[in-house]
Amino acid sequence: MRGVRGGEEVEWVAELKAAVMRRDLERLGRYDHHRARQRVRDSFGGEHSRVIEAGGRPVGSLTVRPGAGGGLTLEHFYLDPAHQGRGIGTRVLEGVLAAADAEGAEVRLTVLRGSAARGLYERYGFIVEDQDEVDVHMVRAVRAGAAGPGGS
């Protein structure tokens, strides 16, 4: 992973988000071409955002921000569908969780209702904190030991 290299990469991430989330957003009746991209433009980049690379090329993104009470918030975690199913996202998530555990920080994230990603997060100890008709807000408590499924 590496830092963001300017506005063109932010636009690339905005397009990636729209492609990755379109099916779920349409299913929920929430897809809007402009809005799907604007949130990334408004909040991706800076010191907390990263571009995920494979073979020296960008394949995904994530942002890990300081959150309330010393915790962390995981946002903009998208992986190009052509690179999904290869363990890249799992390795990135494991790295984020290991760092969070080392800091003694819980991790929060939001996933769309019905998203396949929810299963991955649940395997890594995230539980539902709150939800509405569109979003499921999840949290993972600090764990001692490994960040893999089931903990130490």
Residue spans for each PLM region:
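A short helix-loop-beta-strand connector motif used in the catalytic cores of GNAT acetyltransferases and
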Residues: 41-51, 58-60
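Conserved acetyl-CoA-binding loop-helix of GNAT-fold acetyltransferases
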Residues: 85-98, 119-123
